[in-house]
Amino acid sequence: MSDLRISEAFLYMDYLCFRALCCKGPPPARPEYDLVCIGLTGSGKTSLLSKLCSESPDSVVSTTGFSIKAVPFQNAILNVKELGGADNIRKYWSRYYQGSQGVIFVLDSASSEDDLETARNELHSALQHPQLCTLPFLILANHQDKPAARSVQEVKKYFELEPLARGKRWILQPCSLDDMEALKDSFSQLINLLEDHEAVRM
């Protein structure tokens, strides 16, 4: 091979290296989804979202009105609007539903029968609300680390999810602050539902 061809070969290799290092461009932006997070006071909404955002437990304060958190994942960013769950706040939930692309409903699986019935009624209302009924739902049975916690099967039966949510996109998962892997897996499943839902809409 002549010196000219060798020089051309080296120049071409230098060009390829330059393209790889300098012309790659920024990575594609992660998709963002706007979600609403609802559930009774004490269900653990704020604590779960703060944990996912790697915030200090000492900074967690129960939400009285609403708050918004950007929860980052490897393949998406979830902009979660968390609504307070007190009696005097729940009647205003529907005012904040517009623009949501998905729903997170958190329930206390170790709560009293009265609170569990209230949570069931609120979930039924959300599943049938005109602005939410077609959206993906992630239902989290929280506080699974407590002795009185009900299993996912018990929650599914009590909440009558099979007949009520038939034909809808929903996931029911157990969770607790002690099991972050399970919590992140639940949100990964939700992101898959969100991607599928947006693909169908497009």
Curated annotation (Swiss-Prot):
Provide the alphabetized UniProt keywords.
GTP-binding, Nucleotide-binding
Q: Any stretches that span the bilayer, and where are they?
A: none
Q: Does the keyword Nucleotide-binding apply?
A: yes
Gene3D superfamilies reported in the protein's UniProt record? P-loop containing nucleotide triphosphate hydrolases
- Disulfide bridge positions per record: none
Q: Which GO terms describe its molecular function?
A: GTP binding; GTPase activity
* CDD domains attached to this UniProt entry: Arl9_Arfrp2_like
Q: Which residues bind GTP?
A: 39-46, 82-86, 142-145
Please give the family membership noted in the entry: Belongs to the small GTPase superfamily. Arf family.
State what protein this is by name.
Answer: ADP-ribosylation factor-like protein 15
Q: Which species is listed as the source?
A: Bos taurus (Bovine)
* High-level lineage: Eukaryota, Metazoa, Chordata, Craniata, Vertebrata
